[in-house]
Amino acid sequence: MEMAPAAQVASNPRTVEDIFKDYSARRGALVRALTSDVDEFFGLCDPDKENLCLYGLANGSWEVALPAEEVPPELPEPALGINFARDGMNRRDWLSLVAVHSDSWLVSVAFFFAARLNGNERKRLFNMINDLPTVYEALVDRKHVRDRSGVDSSGKSKHSTKRTGEGQVKRSRVVAEEYEDDDEEHNETFCGTCGGLYNANEFWIGCDICERWFHGKCVRITPAKAEHIKHYKCPDCSSSSSKKTRL
């Protein structure tokens, strides 16, 4: 099957908040491609195909595709030919290389949109971006994340507050085993908004509709507020319900 060029149609965000939302969606997509969806991603990067790129899209999805045909392209392009090195490198090293290039691309797209912002706005955007873990950190810096999560050196798991589907608050574990093979890398929990890895020191809340998990701060829910919510519905599910109601 021939692979078509990526359709990089941008939503053209203009404000700091909208650009950051675009960045977060693309970043979350790339994190998923290199972690929970890594087997699918690996299979799509066939070295026998032409120059392929990994795209994180503004709608939160990802795709492996040929580069855009327009010159110059509508948006900055990600690294070309990521598929060629797939079988010539250690799998973990190859994924790390793709992650580093993906981080560079994400920043270039964000500041492409930020070209008309003033200096203070660009600085604020950069700080917002810098507050999120990079794709590379989400992929390989797991020991650092576990250390920040309060996991002790004995390898025992620590607990933090998460919410169940019944609106109750429960204690859930962050497993602290070393990631000795690639298969174990797929078991991480990522925030449905920012794509950040689970951290036991932060409050998380689960959506009862789509069953995704979110940083409380990303969806503006505090532990105290969560205690009074019987069934939590994330912003995406709330938006979908509103649209159906209006129809």
UniProtKB/Swiss-Prot annotation:
A zinc finger (PHD-type) spans 188-240. PROSITE patterns: ZF_PHD_1, ZF_PHD_2. One of its GO terms (biological process) is regulation of DNA-templated transcription. InterPro entries: Alfin, Alfin_N, PHD_AL_plant, Zinc_finger_PHD-type_CS, Znf_FYVE_PHD, Znf_PHD, Znf_PHD-finger, Znf_RING/FYVE/PHD. SMART domains: PHD. Coiled coil: none annotated. One of its GO terms (cellular component) is nucleus. The record marks Y198, W204, D208, W213 as: Histone H3K4me3 binding. It comes from the Eukaryota. GO terms for molecular function: histone binding; transcription cis-regulatory region binding; transcription coregulator activity; zinc ion binding. CDD domains: PHD_AL_plant. Residues 147-178 are annotated as: Disordered. Keywords: Chromatin regulator, Metal-binding, Nucleus, Transcription, Transcription regulation, Zinc, Zinc-finger. It is found in: Nucleus. Pfam families: Alfin, PHD. PANTHER family: CPG BINDING PROTEIN, PHD FINGER PROTEIN ALFIN-LIKE 3. Histone-binding component that specifically recognizes H3 tails trimethylated on 'Lys-4' (H3K4me3), which mark transcription start sites of virtually all active genes. Interacts with H3K4me3 and to a lesser extent with H3K4me2. Belongs to the Alfin family. The PHD-type zinc finger mediates the binding to H3K4me3. This is PHD finger protein ALFIN-LIKE 3.
